[in-house]
């Protein structure tokens, strides 16, 4: 069940003070983001075309979900948790935002699936060693203390289990510009997020036997920026970007085959095997 308030002080008391404060800030800022979202968006048929493609790819990397014990880290509205539960997984979803958890609970109820929802940061997982068969973490790792989160992921994931992550890449030029002028756009972001670089994967390699990564998307970031110039884009703009994405996404896949360009992709997708 979702909690009624932000991450509680007593739950963060064992963490370094600076990390505890960072988590509190993330919780408060994410609460504000999710309060602005309409309840009408809690609908699997209304998922944004870009997010839908990204989620589909990530869930496929998780393998057979039937009966699998899955930890979904930073679940937001609960989209991925509900989709994996519908596929037969036993899903535990964690979030630092109580507002997001309440939305995720509503989504789960709408689709009649059971989720174990807990208010918890990825840097302090209150689970026993080897609890989970898989971990999914979409657009959340870059909000965390990466070294500590990597340790926690490796600890609670069983031997042979898989971690799948997608996060923004720090070195994509259009995305870098987009982040710098994000206040002009209706960009949902928190103040302490840190997009990943390839060298950041060293923390995962300390706890996982194999860590593979690939770049995802290149020019497509421009379509998202175009949409978000306005908080409520005209339907014709959305139709244009959705149609254009059908072309830019496969084009991006071709472009990113060129040696060296993987490092300037918009997103970095990681599959780590323990």
Q: Predicted regions span which residues?
A:
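Short alpha-helix
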Residues: 193-209, 213-214
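A short glycine-rich, Lys/Arg-flanked "PGG" loop and its adjoining helix->strand segment in the class I
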Residues: 148-159
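A short SAM/SAH-binding and catalytic strip from SAM-dependent methyltransferases
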Residues: 134-146
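Conserved class I S-adenosyl-L-methionine
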Residues: 2-65, 164-187
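A C-terminal cap/extension of S-adenosyl-L-methionine-dependent methyltransferases
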Residues: 218-274
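Class I SAM-dependent methyltransferase SAM/SAH-binding core
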Residues: 71, 77-124
């Amino acid at each position: 069940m979702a909690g009624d308030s932000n991450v509680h002080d007593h739950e963060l008391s064992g963490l370094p003070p600076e990390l505890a404060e960072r988590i509190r800030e993330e919780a408060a800022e994410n609460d504000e983001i999710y309060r602005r979202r309409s309840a009408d968006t809690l609908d699997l048929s209304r998922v944004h075309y870009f997010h839908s493609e990204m989620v589909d790819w990530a869930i496929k990397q998780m393998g057979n979900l039937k009966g699998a014990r899955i930890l979904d880290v930073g679940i937001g509205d609960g989209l991925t948790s509900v989709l994996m539960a519908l596929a037969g997984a036993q899903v535990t979803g964690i979030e630092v935002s109580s507002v997001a958890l309440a939305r995720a609970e509503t989504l789960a109820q709408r689709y009649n699936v059971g989720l174990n929802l807990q208010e918890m940061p990825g840097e302090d997982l209150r689970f026993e060693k080897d609890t989970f068969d898989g971990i999914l973490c979409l657009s959340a790792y870059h909000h965390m203390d990466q070294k500590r989160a990597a340790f926690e992921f490796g600890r609670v994931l069983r031997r042979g289990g898989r971690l799948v992550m997608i996060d923004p890449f720090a070195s994509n030029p259009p995305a870098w510009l987009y982040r710098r002028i994000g206040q002009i756009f209706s960009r949902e972001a928190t103040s302490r997020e840190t997009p990943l670089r390839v060298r950041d994967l060293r923390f995962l390699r300390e706890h996982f036997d194999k860590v593979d990564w690939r770049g995802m998307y290149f020019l497509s970031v421009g379509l998202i920026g175009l949409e978000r110039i306005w908080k409520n884009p005209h339907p014709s703009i959305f139709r244009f970007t959705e149609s254009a994405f059908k072309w830019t996404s496969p084009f991006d896949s071709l472009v990113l085959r060129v040696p060296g360009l993987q490092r300037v992709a918009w997103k970095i997708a990681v599959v780590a095997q323990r």
